[in-house]
């Protein structure tokens, strides 16, 4: 219900999450956590110039995961996906920057690692589609919904990046 209200609110009032304030949700999945890829993944987004505004390590509940993946509930792999995502720690993150949703998806690579180019996270670290290390929002709308699911507003840190003038014109 909360997600529905937030979605309606987001459509009525234009988001402040545009331009260099655009935000996306990323989650390092249990396989990425167990394989100790956190530092490498975070490093890539920091080096790109994006700003980390929230991060936490959680053992996601089945309820949260079912809400998160609700659009996939009719897919044959849905139950396996929810079980897998609940099998270990997940690192939930919010990143901010210009075109961060689109750029993060490019940096992550295709859902199926076999179709991901070298240099992408999945191209470099994944083999199997069922263990593809990281989730990234696929649109601004998804990002807003997913951020609201995983984080309370007071968990997002607003800070001035001293390098911003060296990243953006």
From Swiss-Prot:
Its cofactor is Mg(2+). It is found in: Mitochondrion outer membrane; Cytoplasm; Cytoplasm, Cytoskeleton, Cilium basal body. This is Nucleoside diphosphate kinase 3-B. It catalyses: a 2'-deoxyribonucleoside 5'-diphosphate + ATP = a 2'-deoxyribonucleoside 5'-triphosphate + ADP; a ribonucleoside 5'-diphosphate + ATP = a ribonucleoside 5'-triphosphate + ADP. It is a peripheral membrane protein. It comes from the Eukaryota. The gene is nme3.L. InterPro entries: NDK-like_dom, NDK-like_dom_sf, Nucleoside_diP_kinase. GO terms for biological process: CTP biosynthetic process; DNA repair; GTP biosynthetic process; mitochondrial fusion; nucleoside triphosphate biosynthetic process; UTP biosynthetic process. The active site is at residue 135. Its EC number is 2.7.4.6. One of its GO terms (molecular function) is nucleoside diphosphate kinase activity. Catalyzes the phosphorylation of ribonucleosides and deoxyribonucleoside diphosphates, other than ATP, into the corresponding triphosphates with ATP as the major phosphate donor. The ATP gamma phosphate is transferred to the nucleoside diphosphate beta phosphate via a ping-pong mechanism, using a phosphorylated active-site intermediate. Through the catalyzed exchange of gamma-phosphate between di- and triphosphonucleosides participates in regulation of intracellular nucleotide homeostasis. Required for ciliary function during renal development. Coiled coil: none annotated. GO terms for cellular component: ciliary basal body; cytoplasm; mitochondrial outer membrane.
């Amino acid at each position: 219900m909360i997600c529905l209200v937030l979605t309606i609110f987001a459509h009525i009032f234009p988001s402040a999450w545009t331009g260099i304030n655009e935000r996306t949700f990323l989650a390092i999945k249990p396989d990425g956590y167990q394989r100790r890829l956190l530092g490498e993944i975070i490093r890539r987004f920091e080096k790109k110039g994006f700003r980390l505004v929230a991060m936490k390590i959680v053992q996601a509940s089945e309820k949260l995961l079912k809400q998160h993946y609700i659009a996939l509930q009719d897919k044959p792999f849905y139950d396996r996906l929810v079980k897998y995502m609940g099998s270990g720690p997940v690192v939930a993150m919010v990143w901010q920057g210009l075109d961060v949703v689109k750029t993060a998806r490019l940096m992550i690579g295709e859902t199926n690692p076999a179709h991901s180019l070298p240099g992408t996270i999945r191209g470099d670290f994944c083999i199997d589609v069922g263990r593809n290390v990281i989730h990234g929002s696929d649109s601004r709308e998804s990002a807003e919904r997913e951020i609201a699911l995983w984080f309370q507003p007071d968990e997002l840190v607003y800070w001035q990046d001293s390098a911003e003038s060296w990243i953006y014109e």
